[in-house]
C-alpha cells in the first residue's frame, strides 16, 4: 500500500484560494485545499502528514 502524499515544495504561500478540495491531515483535521494543508505542514516543521484525500 503506497503512502498518500502531496508535493508541498512550493509552499508556504501568503494566501490560499477558497477552492474546496478537502484533505485529511494526520492531526484528524480537514483542510480546505492543498494550499491550506501545505501551509500547515510547513508550520508543523514537516510533522503533519496526509491521512487521505477528502474530509476526515
Curated annotation (Swiss-Prot):
Compartments, record wording? Secreted
Q: Where is this site: Reactive bond 3?
A: 18-19
> Repeat: present as a keyword of the record?
yes
Question: Which SUPFAM superfamilies is this protein grouped with?
Answer: Kazal-type serine protease inhibitors
The reply to whether Secreted figures as a keyword in the UniProt entry is yes
In terms of InterPro entries, this protein maps to: Bifunctional_prot_inhibitor, Kazal_dom, Kazal_dom_sf, Prot_inh_Kazal-m
- One Gene Ontology cellular component annotation? extracellular space
Residues modified by carbohydrate are 45
Please tell me where this protein is predominantly located. Answer: secreted
The record's listing under PROSITE patterns reads:
KAZAL_1, KAZAL_2
Q: List cystine links.
A: 8-38, 16-35, 24-56
Query: What does the domain comment read?
Result: Avian ovomucoid consists of three homologous, tandem Kazal family inhibitory domains.
Q: What is this protein called?
A: Ovomucoid
Q: Give the source species.
A: Phasianus colchicus colchicus (Black-necked pheasant)
Amino acid at each position: 500500500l503506497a503512502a498518500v502524499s502531496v508535493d508541498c515544495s512550493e509552499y508556504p504561500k501568503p494566501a490560499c484560494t477558497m477552492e474546496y478540495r478537502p484533505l485529511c491531515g494526520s492531526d484528524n483535521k480537514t483542510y480546505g485545499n492543498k494550499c491550506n494543508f501545505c501551509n500547515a505542514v510547513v508550520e508543523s516543521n514537516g510533522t503533519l502528514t496526509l491521512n487521505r484525500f477528502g474530509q476526515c
